Amino acid sequence: MPDRTGLFGRTLAAAGTAAALALAMAVPAAAAPSTVEQDVAQLYQDVTDLYNGLPADALRGVDRLIESPIPKIGPRSRAAQGPIPGCTEGSLLTYANQLAAQLTPLENQAFDALSGLSQLYVQGVASDKTPQVFGTDGQYTPRATETIDKLRGFWDIESWNIQLVAWKGTDLGSQAKMAQTFSLGLAPAKVKDAAALATKVLYEVPALQGGRHPLLTLNAFSAPAGSLGGKRVALGDGLLDTVNLLGFDDVSVESVVGHEYGHQVDFAHENHPRNESSEMGPDAYGGYFVAHAKGFAWNSRTQQEVTYLDASIGDCFHSHGTPDQRKAAGAWGEKQATSQGNPNRIVPSATMIEKFQKEYPKLMPPATDQPAVAAVAAARG
């Protein structure tokens, strides 16, 4: 007699298997990370390890023009508090935030890693001993060269060793340059693979545009003598492209380099304010320089354009100064140049610092929130 029970059991087993397969097809398991996702995650870890391996004072005192919307690996100076009521951030910051908002989480992580990596390259490896090319197509090189030459002869500080270097996202495509960068703090055995991975990610994530996406280098910074790479000013291609897009191309290079060199003036005199005057002071010094007869001697219309550029990088976080405060600081500096009795006299840098520190309280609203003031000071360390 046939074993009907066994046949029935096998039929049920077959049916169960079919049902299980159908269920598996209907509710797929979580997809494994793609190769690109794995690459980006590994690169992010490599760059994090690189930053963690840097000397303790490598990034100390480095002043960035803006706080990038990309949450870059490394220290950030924005105060940990909400925005100032009634304040609207400057147009350049608004544009940068709009660019960042378009990124996917994967793209954001890739930008985070590569932006941090590119800053370390331009700070710790790049040198003005090799020809520097400013602008995505080199279009700003003559203006940048003229500006740094004028600044070195304008302010009475040691200037021969202040480098002006180009910050270019396309440098990320050079494995040799990235190997030099990773060598600053990554374990030697990991350097070669990390450098190769950086260039691979640069080209396998289309949003990066091979290093030409402005967010990668939408900034400038000034570094003091004791930091990684020594005294230097870095000027980002992405920043120059964005300033051009916003209509400030006529004054972009001179204003930004003048501002960043203003930080060198502060560094030279050990002036390290723990408030917004740390950025507004260089606005004032830069305004004085571009309006002065021995600087660029720009007319009133061009001076006004400079103050609007100052305003475009104003923020609303008790960090770098609001748009109105940045504009006022730049205008104050310009007025010092145009109203002095002898138009050819250059005020000593120490005197300019002292004069601005006396003016600074007039540019700020009354300090009604003492806890907030304390928080700003704490954030600046």
Question: Where are the model-predicted features located?
Answer:
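Secretory targeting and sorting signals
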Residues: 1-32
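Long, well-structured alpha-helical subdomains associated
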Residues: 36, 291-381
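Extracellular/periplasmic catalytic domains that process cell-envelope and extracellular macromolecules
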Residues: 224-229
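Active-site metal-coordination segments of metallo-dependent hydrolases
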Residues: 270-283, 318-321, 325
